[in-house]
């Protein structure tokens, strides 16, 4: 483990960055053509650094870049002089100070972990006790779009090896089912994550899941199907569809 005297946080820098999105990113609660994010860099006394990023999406989480920058302006000074290896305690303090700013905290926590691992010269998985480093299957997100555009986007990613598609849904049950069915018919061996971004009612989500089941689609997860406080509906959806729910 790196000497604690060399792992003291001496500087926290942050700056806004606009990241153009190739295709409009449309979800049930809004759309975006530019990601208005914030980068964070934490520097240690030995010159080691770590990076993090805040990616607020106001239509989903209520945060925007301005609120992130405001939160960072208050949180950053509290990290100066602290040991980066005390990231757990620092994260707890930040959560207490800014409970409604998870994107801003995420940027700082990621930078803390990055700097801590670089300082200790270990990978992140080792820090957290991971032992299995086999390749994993990941997904690619397809925004809400016309059926033709959806198929075009998915086909491009399919040709690059993706077989698990996280589909943004939640605005039109019948249209959502048709979009997924078109991919199911055209791209063999795929499966879906249905990401509603809180756009469905309980009844609509049940209908969506049933529609996918009827054409033989494989739904491995439903993400944010209903409003975040409707725990009863989430439990009912999990119970009645048999599909895991993440929120």
Describe each PLM feature range.
Residues 2-192, 197-206, 210-213, 240:
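N-terminal capping/lid subdomain adjacent to the active-site entrance of alpha/beta enzymes
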Residues 201-247:
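Active-site loop segments of alpha/beta catalytic cores
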